[in-house]
């Protein structure tokens, strides 16, 4: 009988196909109408499946066909296009005037000068017209002080959250552009060793600097820092803008032998970052921990935090004033930050936005008279020249970028970072998807983005009569308060940033060397 059926199928292929399709849809119909998990499928068998398919591809449909250039979040199409064009070395100019609503509340206007700084006089350091060194030395009293070559740098993103090719590309981009590369709390990996300056971030899990019980081990940290002269600073992560006050977990399926070895954790088990540090529980202990690491490694040590309660910052400023100890730099992460997967409420409602958070912390340290001795770093959607200028005018010495750097190496804002199914291969450990990121090519694009960013910052500074963007003040920015109402940034925020000593750009291109 089987032979007869096969012969019939062979002689009647079209009829067999239709019968096969009919039986397939009958099976799907029976399954849909009998299952209880999905209401729509149960009530509308077969047809109801279209809803879930359209829901699945909805973000892509909206991104490419539905949304206009200014609608999407967190980065709209115009912003992404600027990053992509800059990273590829293409024309990143826009024609036919602005599409922005310049009277919209909060809109910044940068005030140019009638007599700009002559670009013909601009100093070019070692053939790099985009060189913008930090005007301050970080940790001048430490054994190995550090002056960043670039005021635009790559923020904390861990290997584990990002794939190895993405980390390689970012590190090569940082190397070629002179930026530093923050490891993220996942610790220092060999993918960070492509030649860029490194900021080693230490989070609540103390990954890569812990013993077998999970406790922080200074000797392990000292040994690794001693062997790797590329490590220039240590950053203690208190919190991040995406999910402040909440820990994290790298699922067991992602914890392969390589990640386990880098983080000093067990392979095949969930890798947990607690929501609080075990090495300190108050401000005094935090300052002592900072000094312990700084004295042990000789490196500048700072902290990264989103801003919530202000009492912590007041106590920290007072402790630093009394003891002349504490962080050499402070990274303020705005609530706009978003490289970490987070519960929706945390992403939307926990921690203050950058401008408000930075203003509250900075003014506290000004009142205590110690703001000038700290290097201030801003992060949280600051990867565009206009936003960077505002942050600098508020008091930032450096800018850290994360998602914008991801976009420069191919991220398409699919917002699937938390699923391990990043279609661009950036935020995934899937070996097949990762192959889409070529470290050599994407590294060059990351470098071009950072260099293009800095060139535009320099151009804006020159237009406003300055040689270096660090000279911007709150008087150079006006903020729209509605129709026909503008106020200076300085007047709006209620403070004047510290004046940073500046002579000429060339004087700040001497960089202290650290040898292993």
Regions inferred by a protein language model and the residue ranges of each:
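Carboxylate/His-rich catalytic cores and anion/metal-binding grooves
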Residues: 227-251, 310, 315-332
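Glycine-rich tight-turn/loop motif centered on a GG-T
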Residues: 200, 206-208, 252-281, 340-355, ...
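Gly/Ser/Thr/Ala-enriched C-terminal appendages of enzymes
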Residues: 383-388, 392-492, 496-498, 503-515
